[in-house]
């Protein structure tokens, strides 16, 4: 992914986030910026609204959050980004990836906790 972004840096204008699970390292998440620089961490944030929520994420992210707490955290993050950034989307699409399954959830703007 890094090489694809780097080799197409003149025609791509997006950062990428790639996440998944495998039996060797477990959960992993990577961010690849617009020139192909890759970072790995506990979470990744990208897009025009990310500048508005990075501080909130740094202050409130807890690696030991329950699934319910993590979903509320994400809902607040995305709501804050949309509230401050007119270019951030009008809905949320959450995906929970585990060893056993992939669960998808769609949340319309009307259900955002912060508007």
Per-segment meaning from a language model:
Residues 1-115:
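Long, low-complexity N-terminal extensions
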């Amino acid at each position: 992914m890094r090489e694809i972004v780097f080799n197409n840096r003149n025609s791509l204008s997006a950062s990428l986030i790639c996440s998944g699970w495998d039996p060797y390292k477990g959960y992993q998440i990577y961010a690849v910026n617009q020139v192909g620089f890759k970072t790995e961490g506990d979470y990744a944030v990208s897009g025009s609204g990310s500048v508005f929520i990075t501080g909130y994420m740094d202050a409130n992210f807890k690696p030991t959050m329950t699934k319910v707490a993590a979903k509320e955290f994400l809902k607040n993050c995305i709501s804050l980004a949309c509230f401050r950034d007119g270019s951030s989307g009008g809905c949320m699409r959450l995906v929970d990836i585990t060893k056993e399954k992939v669960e998808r959830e769609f949340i319309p703007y009307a259900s955002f906790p912060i508007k």
